[in-house]
Amino acid sequence: MTALSLQQQLAESIYTALGTAFEAGQLGQLTQLPPRQSVVVEKPKVPEHGDYATPVAMSLAKPCRLAPLAIAEAIASYLASDEIGVEVAKPGFINLRLGHRFVAVELQNILELKGDYGRTVPQQPERILLEFVSANPTGPLHLGHGRWAALGSSLERILQFAGYTVDSEFYINDAGNQMQLLGLSLKQRYLQVLGEAVELPDGGYKGSYLKELAEQLVADKGDSLGGEPVEWFSAYAEGRLLEQQKITLQQFRTEFDRWYSERSLHCAGAIEAALADLEARGMLYRAARSRQEQSGEITGRSKKVQAPAAFEEEDGGGEALFFKAADFGDEMDRVVKRADGNTTYLAADIAYHWDKYQRGYGRLINIWGADHHGYVPRMKAVAQALGHPADSLEILIGQMVRLFKTNPETGQKEEMRMSKRRGELVSVDDLIEEVGVDAGRWFLLSQSLNTTVNFDLDLAQSEKFDNPVFYVQYNHARCCSILRKAPERGMPILERFEFLKPDGGLWLETPQERTLALRLLAAPDEYRFAAVDRTPQRLTQYAYDLASDVSQFYEHCPILPPLAENLEPALRYARLGLVVATRQVLATTLTLLGIEPRESM
């Protein structure tokens, strides 16, 4: 386990030097030290400016009433050591260069910690419930579900690696009109297979997967099910389709700690319990219209949004039960129970999140599609109304996935909306069949969540270096190949490698060696930022950059005989140790992304 990441170590050293300068009276009119988190350490865009830098002196110029350069020089005078080289640059940057011993010790840490290198302890440990995918059990999972699966499962691994306690959950949307419609659609398909001239219901499910289910029913049961109620067909379809979703997700390396049925909320009385909790807190009221409608506050746009909920729930002029969502920033209050006594979808969502908090989770993270964006304010309001901070509920909104493939006739990239095999929307199963799990996950993870993924099928299928996942896996396999060949050529893999020369210099002197070493040392920070910022895509970029460094190192720095037989054995072994460390960090990074670190290609 890495106690502190590299940037955290540097920030601590800078803060200590800052405190020493303050105690020595060298920081002008500064009356108290700033908080530790105010010390920012970043990588300069220009390598000549050092390995890392901090602009902290510039942020202190106003309270110190000193020039940033003078502040930087005061801090730097207490910061320089054998392990860190320090220089001050205008207008007040403190540039840091890692010393030979510092680099050698960190590389040895990688070799000793192996797969635990970069595993950290958060400053504020939390128990997190991560909910994602949560599809209706009414059909195969589409590409959007695949994106949430890749993102959620990677984020779970990354958060756990960063020291958080994380459970994952799939919310099964198995209560509502769609389940009745699913059962009716399957029953009609069943009757059609038996030769009856019946039509699918309006708005029914028309996918070929239901026809296949119906054909299987006829094969297993013959014509004996015609008298069964729609509910029987609903339950059968749900069971089969949910099981297929589980198989698909498992193949896509996505597992859940719990599958939570929406229907169970109704059966266990959770909805009434949650509403009773809100009512006891004064968060509900009964009225024919919301407070905003009564006062005329609702604008034309807002009224249009609210009307289907508000008026529909009145049922002939009775009083509905409203949640005071507007008290917490939502644009209006929301109906949770209609005048006829039936609860709304929002009531079930309130109960589900109430139950999450009841189970002791301090932070809830939901991954939703862009079509749920408007639902965020009311759920944030729910969290606050239940007595929790607004930021205890994080809702990550993701954009759609578009699939492109070259048309062999025109040579142009064209968007694929339908699966050629099934004549339906492309599913996660189709994606796995086309490009495999590794490429599928990589390309779905490689973009920011709020960016549409333009998935290039041709590129994902390519076994050339222009395919980023192939390139990264190839360079991991290249490291494995070197490590397999080394003992055969008289260089056994050691438990400990010596990276320092007797005079204190570093054996790894070339630009390619230093670049690769520093990239490895950045891994704990990359993992930490990916966890804190909820950005798994950061690790795809890191893995690609690391693979590029491996390629440059391999090209310019021979390791094994006969190419390296004229080099000093100590240099060859230092390079071999660097390969061992590189393979480990690449493997860890790919594993966190749910991608196989392949040992051969």
Swiss-Prot record:
GO terms for biological process: arginyl-tRNA aminoacylation. It is an enzyme of class 6 (ligase). It is found in: Cytoplasm. A motif ('HIGH' region) lies at residues 135-145. InterPro entries: aa-tRNA-synth_I_CS, Arg-tRNA-ligase, Arg-tRNA-synth_N, Arg-tRNA-synth_N_sf, ArgRS_core, DALR_anticod-bd, Rossmann-like_a/b/a_fold, tRNAsynth_Ia_anticodon-bd. It holds the Pfam family DALR_1. Its EC number is 6.1.1.19. Monomer. This is Arginine--tRNA ligase. It comes from Gloeobacter violaceus (strain ATCC 29082 / PCC 7421).
